[in-house]
């Protein structure tokens, strides 16, 4: 079992420990459960979907990186596939607070990067902040996305974000998590660059058309892709580096052990991720940064 889960594990109900151990007990546990694994755990514990998601929140929060607030938040995104994806808040010392990743963003992006096509629900320790409500409003689940909190009645996003402004108001029909391929190409055989290019081709930027993707090579040899996720309200947009850091951290990697990073974006885009990406990477101790444009 990964060390980050040890402190919280003993606090879980024994029945849940027994049901989870075959999956979470492995060092390569990817902080997600397949639909079949979730079904097995629900049967063993007598849980329904919502009860299981709430029970998993402490385990999800164990992946938080909070050097500034020391306040850990966990989230579980349930895909329409039945898969459960963990999420946790992430902070980075030495960079502006605006670069913080919220637990809901983490869980949603985790699901998106692993190929989930639509979410059924998001479960979180605390009521979603306005930033996250607006971020979720970009999803193809729409305002009927279910939001679950411990010891509270379930509601939909429409309840948390009434009279919302979102992609529909701007005539956007392809939404976040809808499968896309923008078709950009680069002449290279560099695996890390090709991974970043693939991420850019699956990125979501309907407002600026500034598609971008990153790829991080961890010192453990694992490659982590990240896609840009734009938002109708602009500020809640998630940069591609943060998406890659989400996958790196939630998968058990070390965000302070990045061997090399690549950013790929359009040469004539209205905005660029380059300077912000370099700045954050420097704060994380990564100096090997390559930049490519299509």
Swiss-Prot record:
Q: Which residues form a coiled coil?
A: none
Q: Name one GO molecular function term.
A: identical protein binding
Q: Please list the residues that bind substrate.
A: 89-91
What sequence ranges are listed for the domain CMP/dCMP-type deaminase? 48-168, 187-294
Q: Which reaction does it catalyse?
A: cytidine + H2O + H(+) = uridine + NH4(+); 2'-deoxycytidine + H2O + H(+) = 2'-deoxyuridine + NH4(+)
**Cofactor notes:** Binds 1 zinc ion.
Q: Which InterPro entries match?
A: APOBEC/CMP_deaminase_Zn-bd, CMP_dCMP_dom, Cyd/dCyd_deaminase_Zn-bd, Cyt/Deoxycyt_deaminase, Cyt_deam_dimer, Cytidine_deaminase-like, Cytidine_deaminase_bacteria
- Write down the required cofactor(s): Zn(2+)
Binding-site residues for Zn(2+), renumbered to this chain = 102, 129, 132
The answer to whether UniProt assigns keyword Isomerase to this entry is: no
Q: What is its EC number?
A: 3.5.4.5
Could you list this entry's UniProt keywords, alphabetically sorted.
Hydrolase, Metal-binding, Zinc
Any single Gene Ontology cellular-component annotation: cytosol
Query: What does the subunit section of this Swiss-Prot or TrEMBL entry state?
Result: Homodimer.
Q: What does this protein do?
A: This enzyme scavenges exogenous and endogenous cytidine and 2'-deoxycytidine for UMP synthesis.
User: Which NCBIfam families does the entry link to?
Assistant: cyt_deam_dimer, PRK09027.1
* Name by which UniProt lists this protein: Cytidine deaminase
Q: Which organism is it from?
A: Photorhabdus laumondii subsp. laumondii (strain DSM 15139 / CIP 105565 / TT01) (Photorhabdus luminescens subsp. laumondii)
